[in-house]
């Protein structure tokens, strides 16, 4: 891997092909589960000192807010998409917060409680991103990174990867790499479900991390060789650099480009199965002006999300957009993966 900006010694190590942990907040007992899950994952991510306990506080406060004030809510917890640290995302289906700035004030509460809530989370988290809309709901992303790696929490990248309901194994996977050639993202959908699909997806991720700066067709060719004795997979890879996006995919992995007002272009992979009957991979290049968001997702996310979406969805930052798509458009009987990346705005 060629280190990207800020690379070299201490550069971010490749993320593991681990699915997102989802904790539905359907009862107050789920608050304790969310806190325990955050503490465990923070330790697995290598967060030092008191950070695992602080992660538990963040998860507890977010889960408590959903239990008290919202409906249809869940917490999504995982390693940062790129780099070291933990990401905790809360998503619900309403009613939304009417006075967001007041809710961020320490001690503010709409119930007869201590009101530590969002003010405490803002102090603890390395970064905190919130969007809310009356009648639609609220999305919150809190990222915690070690003191020497705070930039890892600031990258405009989002991923979510969930197994089908009732499955212990996830046949989907995602990975992101930042090299001198740009930001490269991978989404994998191993054929079928269960342990064999999961192994195919993990093999594709391992292959990706060996040479993430290779040409996109070469990445798919390497995955094709690595998956020869597996179930095979649908794979999509994109590379974002300057004002262009290159996409190369085989199978039912889709990409869409979003502006603040509309869904621009949509692409799907070439027919075939990586590891079995892959055609010669073709690169398709799209313009990606500053401020463009690229969405890469497997078929576990219903593609109808991209048909006339509301501006609230289009304008979400990448971590919240990934969560909104999974929370709102996931097919519960299939594994689901979303990767979202955004081109930086040019200084005015």
Regions found by a protein language model. Give the residues of each.
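Catalytic core of PPM/PP2C metal-dependent serine/threonine phosphatase domains
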Residues: 198-262, 267, 281, 341
């Amino acid at each position: 891997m060629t280190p990207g900006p800020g690379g070299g010694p201490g550069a971010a190590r490749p993320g593991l092909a681990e699915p997102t942990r989802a904790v539905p907040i359907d009862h107050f007992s789920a608050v304790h589960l969310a806190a325990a899950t955050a503490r465990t994952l923070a330790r697995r991510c290598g967060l030092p000192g008191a950070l695992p306990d602080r992660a538990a506080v963040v998860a507890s406060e977010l889960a408590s807010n959903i239990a008290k004030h919202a409906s249809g809510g869940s917490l999504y917890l995982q390693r940062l998409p790129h780099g070291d640290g933990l990401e905790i995302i809360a998503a619900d289906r309403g009613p939304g917060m009417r006075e967001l700035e007041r809710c961020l004030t320490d001690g503010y509460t709409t119930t007869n409680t201590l009101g530590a809530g969002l003010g405490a989370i803002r102090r603890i988290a390395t970064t905190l991103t919130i969007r809310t809309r009356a009648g639609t709901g609220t999305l919150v992303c809190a990222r915690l990174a070690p003191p020497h790696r705070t930039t890892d929490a600031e990258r405009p990248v989002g991923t979510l990867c969930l197994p089908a309901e009732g499955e212990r194994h996830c046949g989907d996977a995602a990975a992101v790499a930042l090299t001198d050639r740009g930001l490269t993202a991978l989404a994998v959908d191993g054929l079928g479900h269960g342990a064999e699909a999961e192994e195919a997806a993990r093999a594709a991720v391992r292959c990706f991390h060996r040479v993430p700066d290779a040409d996109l067709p070469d990445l798919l060719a390497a995955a094709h060789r690595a998956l020869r004795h597996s179930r095979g997979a649908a794979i999509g890879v994109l590379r974002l650099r300057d004002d262009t996006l290159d996409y190369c995919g085989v199978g039912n992995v889709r990409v869409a480009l979003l502006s603040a007002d509309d869904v621009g272009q949509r692409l799907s992979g070439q027919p075939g199965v990586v590891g079995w009957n892959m055609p010669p991979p073709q690169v398709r290049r799209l313009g990606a002006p500053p401020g463009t968001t690229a969405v890469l997702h497997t078929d576990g996310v219903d593609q109808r999300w991209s048909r006339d979406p509301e501006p609230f969805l289009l304008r979400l930052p990448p971590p919240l957009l990934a969560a909104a798509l999974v929370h709102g458009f996931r097919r519960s009987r299939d594994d689901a993966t979303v990767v979202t990346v955004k081109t930086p705005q040019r200084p005015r």
